[in-house]
Amino acid sequence: MLSDELKLLVGLGNPGTEYEKTRHNVGFMVLEEIARKNNCSFRESKKLFGRTCEYGSGIEKTRLLMPNTYMNESGKSVRSAKDWFDFQNNQLIVLVDDMDLPLGKIRVRSKGSSGGHNGLKSIINHLGTAEFKRLKIGIGAPSNDQQERKSKTVSHVLGRFSKEEFIILNFIIQEIISCIESITSNNWEKISTRLNSYKPDN
């Protein structure tokens, strides 16, 4: 069914060169690699409050969106895209960093709470529902101690990956792209299982 097909991929992050390649921007990084592989260039869209590009044609056309609103207002951009392109919530996948997952792990969910992530929280508020697909990419936590973790959260998510971490991340990004390219109207569960069980050394 058309309503089950992928229409919009949203990568969450913060705009600006000072945030490029930071852990919080891993969603942007995935979309940038997808765009590179499909020879499409991002362009500014004032009406969508973000940068967009598209590839494919007809019912296989997929749009990429990187909000320019900063993380906490990501929902404004996603809502604008939903209204403009007139797609259903189940045609949306949001790619987002997750500090509760170690680097190298992926979690796919078809719905759920924000998990404390301000970008997801904003999207849920603007769409009026938590029933949309999200792909959480582990970036690890700065500490196992809760108090220390809280004090170091901002510097951690706005910090950049080390060379060793980036090697692992690249495996993750390539696996995500491979799965996204194979999504059809009836294999989401299979894709979810594959990503949820993926290990970078596979």
From Swiss-Prot:
Q: According to its UniProt record, which residues of this chain constitute the active site?
A: 24
Alphabetical list of PROSITE patterns matching this protein: PEPT_TRNA_HYDROL_1, PEPT_TRNA_HYDROL_2
Q: Name one GO molecular function term.
A: peptidyl-tRNA hydrolase activity
Single GO cellular component annotation?
Answer: cytoplasm
Q: Which Gene3D superfamilies match?
A: Peptidyl-tRNA hydrolase (3.40.50.1470)
What InterPro entries would the database entry show? Pept_tRNA_hydro, Pept_tRNA_hydro_CS, Pept_tRNA_hydro_sf
Q: Which domain of life is it from?
A: Bacteria
Site note Discriminates between blocked and unblocked aminoacyl-tRNA applies to: 14
Task: Show the catalytic activity.
Answer: an N-acyl-L-alpha-aminoacyl-tRNA + H2O = an N-acyl-L-amino acid + a tRNA + H(+)
Give its localization.
Cytoplasm
The broad enzyme category this protein falls into is: hydrolase
Primary subcellular site in the record, as a coarse category = cytoplasm
GO terms for biological process, alphabetical: protein quality control for misfolded or incompletely synthesized proteins; rescue of stalled ribosome
Site label Stabilizes the basic form of H active site to accept a proton, positions? 97
Provide the E.C. number(s) assigned to this enzyme.
3.1.1.29
Q: Which keywords annotate this record?
A: Cytoplasm, Hydrolase, RNA-binding, tRNA-binding
Binding positions for tRNA? 19, 70, 72, 118
Q: Which SUPFAM superfamilies match?
A: Peptidyl-tRNA hydrolase-like (SSF53178)
> What family does the entry list?
Belongs to the PTH family.
Complexes and interactors:
Monomer.
Q: State the function annotated in the UniProt record.
A: Hydrolyzes ribosome-free peptidyl-tRNAs (with 1 or more amino acids incorporated), which drop off the ribosome during protein synthesis, or as a result of ribosome stalling. Catalyzes the release of premature peptidyl moieties from peptidyl-tRNA molecules trapped in stalled 50S ribosomal subunits, and thus maintains levels of free tRNAs and 50S ribosomes.
Output the HAMAP family linked to this UniProt entry.
Pept_tRNA_hydro_bact
Give the protein's recorded name. Answer: Peptidyl-tRNA hydrolase
Q: Which species is this record about?
A: Prochlorococcus marinus (strain NATL2A)
